[in-house]
Amino acid sequence: MKTKLFYSFLTFALFLVINSAFGQEHTATLICDVQALNNDTPASEACYFAEEEDVNPIDFTIEANIGDEILWSGETDADGNTIQIKKIKFERGTEVFNSSEKEGTSTIVRTVRFSTKNKPDYKYTISFKINDTGRLYKIDPKVRVGGGG
C-alpha cells in the first residue's frame, strides 16, 4: 500500500514538474498616449502593445500553448500616468481559460487551458483605467492557442 501511494505521489509530482517546465509566460504590456485618450481618441488608436508596437491593438494576437501563462499589464508613461488592467473578458471565438472573465487591480495573469487549433481564436476585451480613476477604456485583441503544452 505504501509503495502504491509513493508511486502515485511521484507520478503527480512528475506531472507538475513537466507541466511547469514546458509552460511559458507571455506578456502583453499595454502602452497608451494618455493625452490622446483624454482628448477622446479611441483606445485602439491611442494605445499599442509593447511586444508589437506597429500592430493595431485590435489585431494584436498572443500565440500560446496549453499550460502557458499570459500576463497583461500596463506601463507607466514619462508623466507618471499608470495603466491598470481591470478585466479580461471573453467575447467570442473559442474559450481558452477556465472562466469567461477575470478581474484585477493592475495586472492579470491567466493560464491557458484549452486549444483554438482548427477553431476560431479567443477574442476578448481588456478593460483598463488610467491612474485608477475615471473612465474605463476597452480594447479587443485575441489569443491563438496551439495543441501543445
Predicted segments, located by residue:
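Bacterial Sec-dependent N-terminal signal peptides
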Residues: 1-25
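Short, ordered beta-strand-loop transition motifs
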Residues: 23, 101-106
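N-terminal edge beta-strand
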Residues: 25-66
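Exposed beta-strand and adjacent loop surfaces of beta-rich binding modules
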Residues: 25-27, 69, 82, 123
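Residue-level recognition of well-ordered beta-strand positions that form the cores
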Residues: 31, 73-75, 127-129
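Short, acidic/polar linear motifs in exposed loop/turn regions
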Residues: 36, 76-78, 132
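Contiguous segments within soluble domain cores/interaction surfaces
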Residues: 58-103
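Extracellular/periplasmic metallocenter environments
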Residues: 104-149
